[in-house]
């Protein structure tokens, strides 16, 4: 009986010890989602940081008298390119100058980037599905809102024409994306790389749950 009892106790100890041991495969399954979330979050934050220094919107003006064209690049805090010459040409049709100084959007852009980074961190660390979706939506709304804001500003200048200008044209709305033709000028407008990278960050954050689902056994 003593031998049987000791043997039984040995079996019980072995079972207890093995119960505390987590197989390597299980450990890998636990670590993999953390790595995926961390990598996607870092990549998204990197895209957002780069986007903060790139143009939000660009426009190229083409006309026979300008064989090299004219360029306009709108950043979060400034406008570069041939702004002076474009404003001089716009004066002939009574269009007000593109004056971006003092616009609320210009002052808020750094805050927008900070909010986007905070949303990216939240989307990665939260376990609540609704909160993750809300954070991803916040990042998606940034490029959409930026284009909508630029379109509104373009509508403003296109419908604020001076009736006493040397050349009178019908009020018009320049397109925020795509070509706009006025007299002998054709303007090609498109989103800047900043919005492309922000949309890429949003897509990356949104795809994390689907990636984890594919990786799960």
Question: Language-model features: where?
Answer:
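Short, intrinsically disordered terminal tails adjacent to the first/last structured region
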Residues: 1-22, 101
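Hydrophobic alpha-helical transmembrane segments of integral membrane proteins
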Residues: 4, 20-22, 115-162, 217
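Cytosolic juxtamembrane amphipathic/interface segments immediately preceding
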Residues: 20-32, 183
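N-terminal signal-anchor transmembrane alpha helix
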Residues: 32-61
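Hydrophobic alpha-helical transmembrane segments of polytopic
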Residues: 37-47, 112-113, 135-142, 194, ...
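Long, glycine/tryptophan/cysteine-rich extracytoplasmic
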Residues: 53-106, 151-189
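Hydrophobic alpha-helical transmembrane segments
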Residues: 103-130, 196-205
């Amino acid at each position: 009986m003593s031998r049987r009892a000791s043997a039984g106790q040995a079996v019980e100890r072995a079972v207890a010890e093995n119960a505390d041991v987590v197989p390597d495969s299980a450990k890998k399954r636990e670590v993999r989602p953390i790595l995926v979330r961390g990598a996607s979050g870092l990549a998204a934050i990197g895209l957002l940081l780069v986007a903060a220094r790139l143009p939000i919107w660009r426009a190229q003006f083409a006309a026979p008298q300008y064989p090299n064209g004219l360029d306009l690049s709108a950043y979060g805090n400034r406008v570069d390119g041939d702004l002076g010459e474009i404003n001089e040409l716009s004066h002939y049709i009574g269009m007000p100058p593109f004056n971006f100084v003092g616009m609320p959007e210009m002052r808020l852009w750094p805050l927008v980037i900070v909010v986007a980074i905070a949303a990216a961190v939240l989307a990665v660390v939260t376990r609540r599905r609704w909160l993750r979706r809300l954070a991803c939506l916040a990042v998606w709304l940034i490029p959409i809102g930026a284009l909508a804001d630029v379109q509104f500003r373009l509508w403003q200048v296109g419908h604020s024409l001076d009736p006493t200008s040397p050349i009178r044209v019908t009020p018009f709305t320049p397109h925020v994306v795509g070509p706009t033709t006025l007299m002998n000028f054709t303007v090609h407008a498109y989103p800047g790389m900043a919005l492309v990278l922000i949309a890429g960050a949003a897509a990356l954050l949104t795809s994390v749950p689907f990636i984890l689902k594919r990786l799960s056994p």
